Structure formats: structure tokens, C-alpha cells
Amino acid sequence: MAKTLFVFTSFPRGYSRNCLQSFFKKKELGPKKIDDSSLNNHFSFITRKRLISKIRQQNLLETLALWINKYLSGGGHNKKNQSFDYCINYYFESIREVLTSVLQIVQLQPLLEEINELNSFQSIHSIFPSMEDHFSHRHHFSDIKIPYFIHPEILIRIFRRRIQDAPFSHLLRFVFYEYQNIIVLDKSIPLSWKEISKLSTFLWNYYVHEFESTLVSLWKRTFHFNSFPYGALLDRTQSIRKVKHIEKLPHFKKSPRIIILSGNIPLCVKKYSIHYVRYENNLMIALKGTKFLVHKWKCYIIRFWQYYFHCWFKPCRVSPRESSKECLTFLGYILGIRPQIIVVQAKMINNLPITSIISKELCAIIPVFHSIKLLAREKFCNTLGHPIGKLAWTTSEDDDIPNQFNHIWKNIFYYYSGCLNRNGLYQIQYILRFSCAKTLACKHKSTIRVVWKKYGSRRLFPRYSSYKERESPFLSRVYSHKKRFWYLDVIQVDFIADSLQKGRIPEFKTNFTNKKLIKQLPEQTQYDSVIL
């Protein structure tokens, strides 16, 4: 019996609230968080009435005349043009708020109805249990990057399919071409708070939703895929997985062929499955098949993007990789596959013969070398990994300095709780611990030994390796020590993971083989035994 399964796990940006907050109080090292909480609020007539009165206070003809005069005169930097800019920006800010309100009313309700099928979660760690269960049995991965910049005409064409009002489309075109920075979705680019608005968040959500919904519908119609969600009960320290709506398909006939891939590939009686995972603009597709089939999928995605969005999609944005040789970099982790040995005892009359089953396991490790590079860039250590004092924080109070270091380490430790190379994680703890002590010693012009005696090492920099704060009452402490843990209440990306994902360390994107990954992993000294 042939089965066709399609697992879809998605993290839409606005609804999962995955925008980052900085870990530091004095200096923000991460992007600012976009306040998109009003997307789910009810319609308010008072707010719309205030917007209408604000727009009526401005003279539209006078504002447009000033705007045209500015561009015809060349836009010199004088006081008169500055007053023009203030008047124009104030008017267009009100227009953007009106557009956001109208687009939310028209598009938000059908988007929320369809988003349940895409199965989004707030927890970032909820994606890794799904990848452990399904990605370890796939032969190839495809790492895809969605372009950050969206041409204004693409969004206008998308909205014209839903909104038939021509003046409203012209107003959209006028605003999008005037403020093109709204559609640049790279949060690392320095933009003002007015440009990073609710409208940009909504445009990003709708833009990605159009891509995903169209792609999924084509997959279903072409391959008769039956998608089922990968659910998780978000208990704080446990993940209980459920599978819904599994349907068995009859045997394939001999005649059907894949036409959309531009090749004659007969469908054999096999278990075909496609696993799709996305976080922000990074998405991965895992499938089982030959290299020829993987390259056909690459051509299919590129042509689909160019046909549907009418823009050039660079082939380098789709990088297929073989799971048995190469590793993946996703959300600050290095993901690879290694063989796992399971000891099985077959119960018989006289004795218990022991045999072993070799399976595949998806392993996640923390990139220690690249993480130390990021810490050196932020002046926590030098390039060799030796801790140094954070001189910029010496002006803070004595209690604030340890709290800032503890906050950094706590977020790093809980985010990378699923890694297997714990020695590298404790190396980062060593750097932050001594950097905190050297910062206090530099402030008081003393030595580290005096700081340890005055504050105490445990009180100054407590350890989080015992899982006391997040230990589950259903699991023993031995289990929490020896098994990797995915915390389903982690809803923000760590600073190190975000910097690696954004490509601030170019060496992190290079190919990393499974052989190098296995060398960094601890040996499998304890096997799982199963009695049959």
C-alpha cells in the first residue's frame, strides 16, 4: 500500500512574534522588536475616527504640491525643505495607518482561517522535535533563502487579485513607491521606527502566505498530498506529539507521470513525503530520492517563483545538500546525521540473544568556534577565547553588571539546551564568567581574587546546569542531565544564533561535513535496550 504524506511546519513572522529583543540594557546588540500586537485586536471606530480627523487637518493639495516642488527643486538641505519633509512625513504616516487598517480588515480573516492548516507555533524549539522525527530519514535537504526586498509592483499585483477597487490600488502604488524601505524585510538594516511599522509586518506576513498557500495547493493537486499537522502540547518541559488526518491512498497506476517537473519520472509504489520548515526567510525542504529528483525540485521552485511573483530568483538561493555527507545550518545550530546503535534483546525459551539495530539520528551541535568569534567582536574575549573585561559596562552599578552577564548566559544556555557538545557550551560560560569578574575588578581597580572573595563565585555567576528552574515534575533529574532538552517556552532567538543566521560570520555558511560533526560529539556509551 502506497502512502503519500506531507508534513508542513511553519512559523509566520507576525503571528509567532519571533522578532528579537536585545539582551543588553546599555547597548542593544540585536534588532528591535516590532510591536504587532494590534493585529489581533478588534476593530475600533474611535481609532479610525481619530485617523480621519488627523488627515482632514492636512490640506491634501497643498501637501502634494510641496512634495512635487521638493523633487523638482532637487531637494536641497535648507530649513524650508525640512519643514516640507516634516509636513509630508506626517501626512503619509496617517495614510499608512489607514492602509494598514483597511488591509487588515480585508485580508486578515481569511489569512487566519487558512493559517491553521500551516500549523504555526510560538515556540522556536518546537521545530526541532519534528526535524528529529522526520529529517533523519531523508536523503537530501534543500536550504532556500527568501529574498528580503520585495518590489512594490509585486505586492500591488497580489492585492489586485483580492481588491478590485482601482483608486485604492493607485493609492497603494503611490505609498509603496514613496516609502520603499517599508518593504525591506531585513531587520538588521538600520531603519527608523516610523518605517518599521505594522504595515511592514503585515506585508511580510501576506507576502509569505501567498507563496506558501500557492505552493501547497500545487503540491496537493499534482501529487495528491494529504497534509497533516505536527502538533505539540506546549507543556513547559515536555512535548507530546500527535498526528491527525492520516489517509491511505490506493496503489498508483502505471501511467501517471510528473509533468510539472519537466521530466518523465514515473511514480513507483513507495512512501513519498516532503517536509517543509520555515523560520522568517529561511526555509528547508527535506525529501527522499535521487540527485536528479532533487535538482528537478530546485528548478521547479525557481520557475514557480519567477512565474508567480514575476521576479528573478537567483539559483544560488536554493542549495541542495546530501544528508549523509553535508550538514545544515539552521537557527544557529549545525545539524547533521550520525548512526545510532540500539541494543535489542529477543526473548526466547533458553537465552536472550542480544542484537543491535543501526538507525540514523539527527544531531544538533553549537558552533563553538564561531560563537567565540562573536563574543570577541562584542569585546567579551579576544580572538583566542581569553576573557577580557567589558569596559563599556564599568559605569553601571555593581548589581547590574552580574545581572547583565547572567541574563546573557541564561538565554544562551536554554536556547542551546538541545546540543550534544556540552563542553563547548560550558566554554562559553567560562568566558562570560571571567569577563564578568574582570569587569568588576576593572571598575574597583582590584583583582579577580578580591572580587571572588567579596561576591562569591556562585552568587556572582550562578550555574544553570542543574535544571533546577525548569525541571519537570514528571521526569527524573538523571534523565534531564543525560538527555538533550528542547524547551517549548523559548519564543525568542538567541543573540548568537541570530547573528550566525544573518550571516555576520561568513565562515559559518561554509560546508560542514558529517565526519567533522561526529568528531565533536561524545561517544555513545549508553545504548537504549528494548526487549522483544
Swiss-Prot record:
Signal peptide as annotated in the record: none
Keyword tRNA processing included in the entry's annotation: yes
Gene Ontology terms: biological process: mRNA processing; RNA splicing; tRNA processing
Keyword Plastid carried by entry: yes
This protein's GO CC annotations: chloroplast
Any Pfam family: Intron_maturas2
Source organism, top-level taxon: Eukaryota
Subcellular locations according to the entry: Plastid, Chloroplast
Keywords: Chloroplast, mRNA processing, Plastid, RNA-binding, tRNA processing
HAMAP family cross-referenced by the UniProt entry: MatK
Family classification: Belongs to the intron maturase 2 family. MatK subfamily.
Function comment: Usually encoded in the trnK tRNA gene intron. Probably assists in splicing its own and other chloroplast group II introns.
Protein name, as recorded: Maturase K
Lineage: Eukaryota, Viridiplantae, Streptophyta, Embryophyta, Tracheophyta
